[in-house]
Amino acid sequence: MRKILPLRAWLAAGLILGSPFSHAASNLVFCSEGSPAGFDPAQYTTGTDYDATSVTLFNRLVQFERGGTRAIPALAESWDIGDDGKTYTFHLRKGVKFHSTDYFKPTREFNADDVLFTFERMLDKNHPFRKAYPTEFPYFTDMGLDKNIARVEKLDEHRVKFTLNEVDAAFIQNLAMDVASIQSAEYAGQLLEAGKPQQINQKPIGTGPFILSRYQKDAQIRFKGNKDYWKPEDVKIDNLIFSINTDAAVRAQKLKAGECQITLNPRPADLKALQEAANLKVPSQPGFNLGYIAYNVTHKPFDQLEVRQALDMAVNKQAIIDAVYQGAGQLAVNGMPPTQWSYDETIKDAPFDPAKARELLKKAGVAEGTEITLWAMPVQRPYNPNAKLMAEMIQADWAKIGIKARIVSYEWGEYIKRAHAGEHDAMLFGWTGDNGDPDNWLATLYGCDSINGNNVSKWCDAAYDKLVKAAKRVSDQDKRSELYKQAQHILKEQVPITPIAHSTVYQPMNKSVHDFKISPFSRNAFYGVTNQP
């Protein structure tokens, strides 16, 4: 086993930024907040996973422009949509090379076979690779792509055709998402033949701007620039290092000390010092996000509407905004942010009313002192800068109405895994939009198809689901908006969640970092970025 030196050793050796004698402009250290659960992006749902995989190592047929929401050509140079809106023919880019590593040497360039493998593995539970390495693809399923993609066909080496069962107004946007990252069919075949298919999640091969070099869980991930990248002007960093630390205060100190050049999700308490540091800049933008409490409606007493209403109106949201977000948050009312088109501004929040909450609990037959669990995420997220404090404040609010909440936390990957399995009673959860479409909120987080994935409330309402699915099949945006607004009213009335806040996103970095663009989807992309002290 090769020894992985701690970050300080690399710094001392002058191999990373900080030494005037190193070729610093070609190296960059990112103070990351957590370890990825794995390196196969199709298996995961969080930004922590995607930063280390889909954004860095992989490409998709189409991708979102850096810092924006527009889907642009990537591994597909162009595409044609059939008159019925159900067929999409993609014309693939030629000359694209897969990563060459010590564990895989490609013998051919990217072609249609790779697209087929990528999607057939997710569509067909009897696919040979999936049978050898059984896994689930929760986000792919949450979006309903497993049901709506009827087939994927290879027309020739550089053309593939997707046929849908129903019109999907968000299909191109969905193909730009992380779960649609293109894998190497040749590499998968090699792993299958060797009896090691699980290595697709440990030793990744993509076509992206960086290549995985080394990984030490909870310590660092090292990438090297892909010199064979199909868009060479985007690879301006020779060595990209993710220095992992779950403590935001430590990340801030490392940034100020020059041990890393960029970080994410600073604590509100650290913002002023970061903004005043002479060597730093702290760009910001309104967050396309939502932090909320999810109630598991499959657990008693959360199956009763009166109980959910009571817990909702017992939470002092303004106090949370003041203490947790410290002025960098906006009170949330709906299940998506107000910057999302189709947001219904007519919907009002329930008033903060502990006395009425007690009455509702009594009506529901919930005894004084009833015990429940309240899960709190162990890491900072763009939508929740301090989950521990938020959970403690909610715990205190619920205690005032006779509910005893026991706070539970797990390592981030385990937290998500157990949430998908529905082990919680109530939990702090949140979302940053992934594609700019309302479906990414209203279906992915609250739809019936998502109850085994990101719908951690496990709430399935037939009337709501009918509206959301109908909206996806309509191309006219005004008509879609009307359907989505009706769905938002049902969501608010049924209270599977308590929306808490939309946060402002801050991205502290050294002034030496240039051309980094804050993503509306909270991705951290380092292609096209330079570091010039």
From Swiss-Prot:
PROSITE patterns given in the database record: SBP_BACTERIAL_5
Originating gene: dppA3
MF GO annotations: peptide transmembrane transporter activity
CDD domains in the record: PBP2_DppA_like
Family, as annotated: Belongs to the bacterial solute-binding protein 5 family.
Protein known as: Di/tripeptide-binding protein 3
Signal sequence, renumbered to the chain: 1-24
Coiled-coil boundaries: none
One BP annotation, GO: dipeptide transport
Presence of the UniProt keyword Signal in the record: yes
Keyword Isomerase: no
Cross-referenced Pfam families: SBP_bac_5
Its job: Part of the ABC transporter DppABCDF involved in the uptake of various di/tripeptides. Prefers dipeptides with acidic residues at the C-terminal end. Involved in the uptake of phaseolotoxin, a toxic tripeptide inhibiting the enzyme ornithine carbamoyltransferase.
